[in-house]
């Protein structure tokens, strides 16, 4: 199933409008010779805020990737948001990736918690615990707990989350956005089988991160 939304993320509309107005004004005054860098900037802003539809795998026990990017961690560690030991899989997004976040599983949101913090390079490990972040804890119908954490980065300094505790989420459903480079950590129950490896390029909703133990 696909979840309809604008192909250009609504979070980017103000930025696109500002870039377009500036480019048009400079073009009107000085011509294309002066305006071309601003048209180029407009193209960059539009591509940054693109938010394409993605196919969603049908496997019921699959954990879907919540964001586009590259895998930077697959490890067993402590999940501080659900107070348990867990399998953590981390996705780093650079400024050229799509920056919307989508639910990795079907379930109910049991907790949403925001933490202020630093703005370190999101590709490094300590960004998980020291950077500004927003944690979403989801419980599936089978009782499994999946935690998805939006983490701000060196450039990204605005985390947006559109769900609250008690609300349902469907796999692949868009729930948040981080502007200009960031990271998402996913914590899974021990026994889950990772289906990705470090360095692998992944895509929101269409890449299977892991399989939950049945």
From Swiss-Prot:
Q: Name one GO cellular component term.
A: plasma membrane
- UniProt cofactor note: Binds 1 pyruvoyl group covalently per subunit.
Question: Which residue positions does Pyruvic acid (Ser) occur at?
Answer: 182
A GO molecular-function annotation? phosphatidylserine decarboxylase activity
The membrane topology term of the UniProt record is: Peripheral membrane protein
Name the Pfam families for this protein. Answer: PS_Dcarbxylase
Enzyme Commission number(s) of this protein: 4.1.1.65
Q: Which domain of life is it from?
A: Bacteria
The reaction(s) this protein catalyses: a 1,2-diacyl-sn-glycero-3-phospho-L-serine + H(+) = a 1,2-diacyl-sn-glycero-3-phosphoethanolamine + CO2
Per its UniProt record, the required cofactor names are: pyruvate
**Tagged with keyword Amino-acid biosynthesis:** no
Active site: residue positions:
182 (schiff-base intermediate with substrate)
What are its GO biological-process terms? phosphatidylethanolamine biosynthetic process
* Keyword Signal belongs to the record: no
Chief location category: membrane
Cell compartment(s), UniProt: Cell membrane
Site (Cleavage (non-hydrolytic)) location in chain: 181-182
Q: How is it modified after translation?
A: Is synthesized initially as an inactive proenzyme. Formation of the active enzyme involves a self-maturation process in which the active site pyruvoyl group is generated from an internal serine residue via an autocatalytic post-translational modification. Two non-identical subunits are generated from the proenzyme in this reaction, and the pyruvate is formed at the N-terminus of the alpha chain, which is derived from the carboxyl end of the proenzyme.
Q: Which keywords does UniProt give here?
A: Cell membrane, Decarboxylase, Lipid biosynthesis, Lipid metabolism, Lyase, Membrane, Phospholipid biosynthesis, Phospholipid metabolism, Pyruvate, Zymogen
Tell me, how does this one assemble? Heterodimer of a large membrane-associated beta subunit and a small pyruvoyl-containing alpha subunit.
Against PANTHER family, the record matches this protein to: ARCHAETIDYLSERINE DECARBOXYLASE PROENZYME-RELATED
Q: Which family does it belong to?
A: Belongs to the phosphatidylserine decarboxylase family. PSD-A subfamily.
Q: What does this protein do?
A: Catalyzes the formation of phosphatidylethanolamine (PtdEtn) from phosphatidylserine (PtdSer).
Q: Which NCBIfam families match?
A: AS_decarb, PRK05305.1-2, PRK05305.1-5, PRK05305.2-5
Under what name is this protein listed? Phosphatidylserine decarboxylase proenzyme
Organism, per UniProt? Burkholderia ambifaria (strain MC40-6)
């Amino acid at each position: 199933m696909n979840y309809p939304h604008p192909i250009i993320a609504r979070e980017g509309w103000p930025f696109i409008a500002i870039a377009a107005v500036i480019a048009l004004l400079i073009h009107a005054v000085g011509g294309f010779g002066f305006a071309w860098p601003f048209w180029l900037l407009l193209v960059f802003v539009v591509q940054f805020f693109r938010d394409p539809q993605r196919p969603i795998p049908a496997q019921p026990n699959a954990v879907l990737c919540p964001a586009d990017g590259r895998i930077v961690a697959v490890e067993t560690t402590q999940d501080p948001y659900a107070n348990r030991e867990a399998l953590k899989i981390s996705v780093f997004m650079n400024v050229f990736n799509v920056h919307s976040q989508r639910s990795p599983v079907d379930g109910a949101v049991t907790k949403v918690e925001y933490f202020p913090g630093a703005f370190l390079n999101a590709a490094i490990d300590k960004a998980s615990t020291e950077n500004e972040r927003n944690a979403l804890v989801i419980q599936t119908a089978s009782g499994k707990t999946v935690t998805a954490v939006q983490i701000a980065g060196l450039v990204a300094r605005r985390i947006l989350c559109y769900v609250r505790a008690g609300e349902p989420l469907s796999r692949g459903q868009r729930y948040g956005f981080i502007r200009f480079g960031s990271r998402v950590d996913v914590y899974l129950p021990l026994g889950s089988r990772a289906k990705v490896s470090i360095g692998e390029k992944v895509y929101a909703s269409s890449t299977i991160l892991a399989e939950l133990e049945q």
